């Protein structure tokens, strides 16, 4: 019979593996070659390298996210500024008719004094502060980007230059945006270069000198005639 309290042999069914981790072989006395994975600290070095790679990857992801956010922020600010400019331009455009009425009143002398003058001055000051600029004056060069010609005098031949002769309605510009083109009448003028102008001036000077010489000669002749008449006759 088998005793129920008999303990099983500790060596039965179990295999014990003993690993000699000594770096020096006790039999040969030489240093053993240990694979990197089996060296003490080899696992730690591999973990450190893996950690560095992971940190570099996460750092690159963070930098990319930061760049994307910076671009988004710039785009949002740009869109916000564009929306504000459109709203401001829309409001100012509604007041251009009021400015036209005030300009007509100014030409008739109705804004020389009184409460209306104060209102007009304050409105002009406020719109100027917003960046509103009026353009279109007689004598300015005609610019099709800013001006709309409703009249044209001249043949527009070679050497001519179109300038504004009359202004029917002023134009307005808010920043770089043209809110309204100026209605103008265009007159073609002849462009004279510096050489032609100098030659014309020289010719005028020569003509003036010749006229002065002729006048001096005439005065000298008159003087001699008067002296001859004033001298007594020898007979």
Curated annotation (Swiss-Prot):
Residues 1-18 have a biased composition (Polar residues). GO terms for biological process: protein folding. It holds the Pfam family GrpE. Keywords: Chaperone, Cytoplasm, Stress response. Residues 1-50, 198-235 are annotated as: Disordered. Disulfide bonds: none annotated. SUPFAM superfamilies: Coiled-coil domain of nucleotide exchange factor GrpE (SSF58014), Head domain of nucleotide exchange factor GrpE (SSF51064). Participates actively in the response to hyperosmotic and heat shock by preventing the aggregation of stress-denatured proteins, in association with DnaK and GrpE. It is the nucleotide exchange factor for DnaK and may function as a thermosensor. Unfolded proteins bind initially to DnaJ; upon interaction with the DnaJ-bound protein, DnaK hydrolyzes its bound ATP, resulting in the formation of a stable complex. GrpE releases ADP from DnaK; ATP binding to DnaK triggers the release of the substrate protein, thus completing the reaction cycle. It comes from Mycobacterium bovis (strain ATCC BAA-935 / AF2122/97). Residues 19-35 have a biased composition (Basic and acidic residues). This is Protein GrpE. Homodimer.
């Amino acid at each position: 019979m088998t005793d129920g309290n008999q303990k099983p042999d500790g060596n039965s069914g179990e295999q014990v593996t003993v690993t000699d981790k000594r770096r020096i072989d006790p039999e040969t006395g030489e240093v053993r070659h240990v694979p990197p994975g089996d060296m003490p600290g080899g696992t730690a070095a591999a973990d450190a390298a893996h950690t560095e790679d992971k940190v570099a990857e996460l750092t690159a992801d963070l930098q990319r996210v930061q760049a994307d956010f910076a671009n988004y922020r710039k785009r949002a600010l740009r869109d916000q500024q564009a929306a504000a400019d459109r709203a401001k331009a829309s409001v100012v455009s509604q007041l251009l008719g009021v400015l036209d009425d005030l300009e007509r009143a100014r030409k008739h002398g109705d804004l020389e004094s009184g409460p209306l003058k104060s209102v007009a001055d304050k409105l002009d000051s406020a719109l100027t502060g917003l960046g509103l600029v009026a353009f279109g004056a007689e004598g300015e060069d005609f610019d099709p980007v800013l001006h709309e010609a409703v009249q044209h005098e001249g043949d527009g031949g070679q050497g001519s230059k179109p300038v504004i002769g009359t202004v029917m309605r002023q134009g307005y510009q808010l920043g770089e945006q043209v809110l309204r083109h100026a209605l103008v009448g265009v007159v073609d003028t002849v462009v004279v270069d510096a050489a032609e102008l100098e030659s014309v001036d020289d010719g005028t000077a020569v003509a003036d000198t010749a006229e002065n010489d002729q006048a001096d000669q005439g005065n000298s002749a008159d003087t001699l005639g008067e002296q001859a008449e004033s001298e007594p006759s020898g007979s």
